[in-house]
């Protein structure tokens, strides 16, 4: 194992990440998509994704004083759902989405929520900073999902929770082929439809304590304990 990485090696997506989907997606492209849809995101996706958000918050079991990191906070649609006796940090790399989130947090007086512009694959926090690290509907929207999850694990405290809600490719052979077929189309609204859940878990090394289907059968809530 090399002691030092070349800078260009750091920027190159993990080949295992690329193998999880038939589609490559670049951060600049995704940022452009979310810049365009920021104003209508809540209307387009709020209702259909809301059950998964509620279930994730319920399953987290947030305790008073817990430090929670939401990776991919978007428009801050989750912000008002968190109990006020915890500390929430929300990060996103889209200035347009964060502008909506900041307006929401200010309007609702959510003093326990802070928002920061940041790349999910390069979290600017010390190791073991958070009790719960949560990525709602994110990992199929980034160029390197494995790198993002490694960062989530790094900043999660030992025995803390890593919580992921995401669309994964169906285990049904017919639906699986459909997921792969439409992924080149769904990428135009900012996500890959064919991310493989077993492959994702194997490559990240995450060991789930629970996996549940949410909203519709193709979305899953995955909760892992950080060892």
Predicted segments, located by residue:
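A short SAM/SAH-binding and catalytic strip from SAM-dependent methyltransferases
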Residues: 132-144
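C-terminal lobe and adjacent flexible extensions of AdoMet/dcAdoMet transferase-like proteins
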Residues: 222-227
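Short glycine-dipeptide loop
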Residues: 65, 156-162
């Amino acid at each position: 194992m090399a002691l030092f990485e070349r800078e260009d090696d750091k920027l190159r997506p993990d080949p295992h990440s690329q193998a999880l989907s038939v589609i490559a997606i670049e951060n600049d492209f995704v940022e452009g998509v979310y810049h365009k849809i920021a104003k209508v995101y809540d209307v387009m996706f709020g209702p259909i994704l809301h059950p998964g958000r509620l279930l994730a918050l319920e399953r987290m079991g947030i305790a008073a004083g817990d430090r929670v990191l939401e990776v991919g906070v978007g428009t801050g649609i989750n912000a008002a759902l968190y109990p006020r006796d915890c500390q929430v940090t929300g990060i996103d790399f889209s200035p347009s989405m964060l502008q909506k989130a900041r307006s929401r947090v200010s309007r609702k007086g959510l003093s326990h929520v802070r928002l920061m512009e940041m790349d999910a694959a390069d979290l600017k926090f010390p190791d073991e900073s958070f009790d719960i690290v949560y990525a709602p509907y994110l990992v199929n929207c980034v160029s390197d999902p494995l790198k993002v999850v490694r960062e989530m694990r790094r900043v999660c405290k030992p025995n803390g929770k890593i919580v992921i809600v995401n669309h994964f490719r169906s285990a049904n052979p017919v639906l699986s082929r459909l997921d792969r077929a439409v992924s080149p189309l769904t990428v135009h609204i900012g996500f890959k439809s064919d991310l493989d859940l077993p492959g994702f878990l194997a490559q990240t090394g995450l060991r789930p304590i629970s996996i549940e289907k949410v909203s519709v059968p193709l979305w899953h809530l995955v909760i892992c304990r950080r060892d």
